[in-house]
Amino acid sequence: MKLLLGDEIGQLKFIEIKKGTDTSNPESEAPVIQKFGELDREKGVLFMLKHEMNVFVARKNGTIECWNVNQEPPILSSLWQLDSSLLETASIVSMKYSNGWLMLALSDGNLLFRHIESSKLRKLQLHGPLSAVELHPRIPGIIAAGGKENDVCLYSCNPTCKSNIDELELWRTENVVKVFQGKNVKNDSLNLRVRVWITGIVFTEDIINVIDGKSEDDESLCFHFATITHYGQLRFYDTKHGRRPVSTFDVSTSPLSHVGLLPSIKLLYFADKRAQISIFDHSKKKVIGRFQGVKGAPSSIHCLGNVVAITGLDRNVRIFDADRKPLANAYIKALPTSIIVINERDAEIIKKEEELEAAKEEEEEIWRNMEQLEDTEDKKPSKRIKL
């Protein structure tokens, strides 16, 4: 398996690790680690995301880089440098990519967009503070945001929710409108107001078998998503059924920090700051299991196919399959802050498959040449014998 890891001292590490590796065992095979970049805490890695063969890296000092991981060694290019004045009173809370646009969200409500091909820049100002921002994974121009005492809102610059919209028309300030404003749950059993602090958002159409946007029978917009909170709640929303969540669950006594989907098994995961990473089944409305062995609060979780990679304060990279079976574990000296699974399969298996494929093609080529030779022999004119 191949991973890309960013750390607090500014380095990026390519890690090749085999299934079954466990560096806590002295007899285990060590992973192969390639390091890139100089040691500089001001350039500490905050976020990474992968699109096709490019990995975008957001650093603490506002530098945004693009890595082409298809090259050997990977090619690094500086993509964008944020104005330092933007980071004097705010911090980067999210980085997302959708339909040609890279988005950076700041805690004060500023959203900055850059079109990768044309280098066009656009800026939106949402109501802050923000601690969670998410773009819809399928529908262009849909964004969800929320924060401390700032309940979740949906904004759109694509009113028809069509997928073939001209991407250069996205994120124009004059076209962005609020399409949903979340409402707090009812007072608790003591008739006290429930505090609001959104710390994560994920759109859930992939795990509950629905389609967001507009349907042929109904012109009204409909979106399905989940939020996590600083106060340990997991909430599900269906915008057709009102502004309040359709269901809410107290799943932890510790602040929740991460939420995401496991599409291969139609489940959702969430993590708290006590190193509990849990799996939630929406159809059963309950937690059905946890990833075991994680010792420190997670700083980053990434899922690719059937593989889940987790890293955090215990300075370990832990890899599981989607059914929570441990696949590998490696200790990393510098505190990891972000992780991406580049390839979920072992390099040796890929090499063997490539060799088998090459041998198969060679054998087929030999048979094709033999058939052509036989056809040529059959077409040769036979000599007549004179009597």
From Swiss-Prot:
Ranges for region Disordered: 368-387
Q: What phylogenetic lineage does the species belong to?
A: Eukaryota, Fungi, Dikarya, Ascomycota, Taphrinomycotina
Per the record, the domain of life is: Eukaryota
Sum up the protein's function in the record's words: Involved in the biogenesis of the 60S ribosomal subunit.
* Subcellular locations according to the entry: Nucleus, Nucleolus
Q: Which family does it belong to?
A: Belongs to the NSA1 family.
Q: How does it assemble?
A: Component of the pre-66S ribosomal particle.
Q: List, alphabetically, the InterPro entries matched.
A: WD40/YVTN_repeat-like_dom_sf, WD40_repeat_dom_sf, WD40_rpt, WDR74/Nsa1
* One annotated Gene Ontology cellular component of this protein: nucleus
Could you mention a single GO BP entry for this protein?
A: rRNA processing
Q: Which UniProt keywords apply?
A: Nucleus, Ribosome biogenesis, rRNA processing
Q: Which organism is it from?
A: Schizosaccharomyces pombe (strain 972 / ATCC 24843)
Xref: SMART domains: WD40
Descriptive protein name: Ribosome biogenesis protein nsa1
